[in-house]
Amino acid sequence: MDLLSALTLETWVLLAVVLVLLYGFGTRTHGLFKKQGIPGPKPLPFFGTVLNYYMGLWKFDVECHKKYGKIWGLFDGQMPLFAITDTEMIKNVLVKECFSVFTNRRDFGPVGIMGKAVSVAKDEEWKRYRALLSPTFTSGRLKEMFPIIEQYGDILVKYLKQEAETGKPVTMKKVFGAYSMDVITSTSFGVNVDSLNNPKDPFVEKTKKLLRFDFFDPLFLSVVLFPFLTPIYEMLNICMFPKDSIEFFKKFVYRMKETRLDSVQKHRVDFLQLMMNAHNDSKDKESHTALSDMEITAQSIIFIFAGYEPTSSTLSFVLHSLATHPDTQKKLQEEIDRALPNKAPPTYDTVMEMEYLDMVLNETLRLYPIGNRLERVCKKDVEINGVFMPKGSVVMIPSYALHRDPQHWPEPEEFRPERFSKENKGSIDPYVYLPFGNGPRNCIGMRFALMNMKLALTKVLQNFSFQPCKETQIPLKLSRQGLLQPTKPIILKVVPRDEIITGS
């Protein structure tokens, strides 16, 4: 009390002015949506609506969609987000106005060399990367990579056979995480890693360290709430990604390039070699479009990011869905057996042409879109469908909420692969089903991811059936943090279909 009474009137006035200024700074953008009559949860000074994410992005988006309709306003700190579920607006953002207005994704802090990755890069730099990398994902290239991936399918089958013989239930994420790790390191870097049996391999350890992410990490939260900190962090050489992992991959790419200069190695088919071929093309060098060593490293690392978590999680979700829907599992196994009688080795064409397999995978991706949301930055003032969006604001498309919208999907919580049958698929609006995005900036590795997952499912379902056990969570509950994950690991009983196990 003595301290307070000692303060002069001028000091009190100064404190009041400072508090008013701080409040004004912390709420300076928060009137944007109110002016346009756009509803949304009430933002807090400085934090905006970020604290609501604690319930889980997916859950928050579903609740907002139910409460506010086709458009609502959010604030990540001071950053305004236009959340849209109107399909015409989504089409405008992802396709019609992609190159002119909504080309780029949002910045999320200091990312170092990862700013040169195709999924992070902006404008002309992104177009250049996309043009150089797109030939890597043609069906012809994927067919060439198919045998590389198939060998890891055989390792997967062998491991599951050993686990099934013990009679103990199996944690799906452990198994498919290892499969995804092996496939992505082999196809990205040309490294053969048996991560199930060699979890201490330096490549595995550095990759796993790189993949650790927490939405509530203090560094990440600080740049979400205060984007102006990003250039300061960059000046201080602070990066969102672990420096030792980035350095490891930079050195590795350099060593691999040196090793592959001989004529024998240069014919290997993987993403690293295909990027090196583009780098060494004389015409590309002269026109300054070839990928530099740093750019090759960034693309290789982003392939790991895009290929590991979505693949391993989606495969786990698929098998949980099949285990809890045995009739669907049996129907899929029958299709696989018809296409590949007597457990014949799968081929690229056979795997990609199986209709029911495609239906099951599509329905799983509808129920469990790993990324939850799509985002695009508005790079100039624009009006879309009568809504004014200022330069620098973000348009957010809540894909999870769209995928569970009863207006588009009857009984949306039910697992029904028949939604994606030939008869029904044509009636699905492409802007309400967005597991890989849409438009020019959709996921460049979509075809690779689908091939990879379909091959794994074909291999395991040729040889095993999956059943719930006492450790299986039914119904599945989703975690509140980060990418879409179950609250508990998916654990299932693995039962050999007969004594003939292919790939063993």
Curated annotation (Swiss-Prot):
Membrane topology, from the record: Peripheral membrane protein
Keyword Ribosomal protein listed: no
Cofactor names: heme
The keyword DNA-binding appears for this protein: no
One MF term in the entry's GO annotations: testosterone 6-beta-hydroxylase activity
Protein's GO biological process: oxidative demethylation; response to cadmium ion; response to dexamethasone; response to genistein; response to glucocorticoid; response to metal ion; response to nutrient; response to xenobiotic stimulus
Expression induction or repression: By pregnenolone 16-alpha-carbonitrile (PNCN).
Catalytic activity: an organic molecule + reduced [NADPH--hemoprotein reductase] + O2 = an alcohol + oxidized [NADPH--hemoprotein reductase] + H2O + H(+)
Localization per Swiss-Prot or TrEMBL: Endoplasmic reticulum membrane; Microsome membrane
Gene source species: Rattus norvegicus
GO CC, alphabetical: endoplasmic reticulum membrane
Descriptive protein name: Cytochrome P450 3A1
Domain of life of the native organism: Eukaryota
A Pfam family recorded for this sequence: p450
Gene3D superfamilies: Cytochrome P450 (1.10.630.10)
Effect of F213I: In strain: Wistar
InterPro entries the record matches: Cyt_P450, Cyt_P450_CS, Cyt_P450_E_CYP3A, Cyt_P450_E_grp-II, Cyt_P450_sf, Cytochrome_P450_3A
Entry binding sites for heme: C443
Predominant location category: endoplasmic reticulum
Record family assignment: Belongs to the cytochrome P450 family.
Protein role: Cytochromes P450 are a group of heme-thiolate monooxygenases. In liver microsomes, this enzyme is involved in an NADPH-dependent electron transport pathway. It oxidizes a variety of structurally unrelated compounds, including steroids, fatty acids, and xenobiotics.
Keyword list, A-Z: Endoplasmic reticulum, Heme, Iron, Membrane, Metal-binding, Microsome, Monooxygenase, Oxidoreductase
Its EC number(s): 1.14.14.1
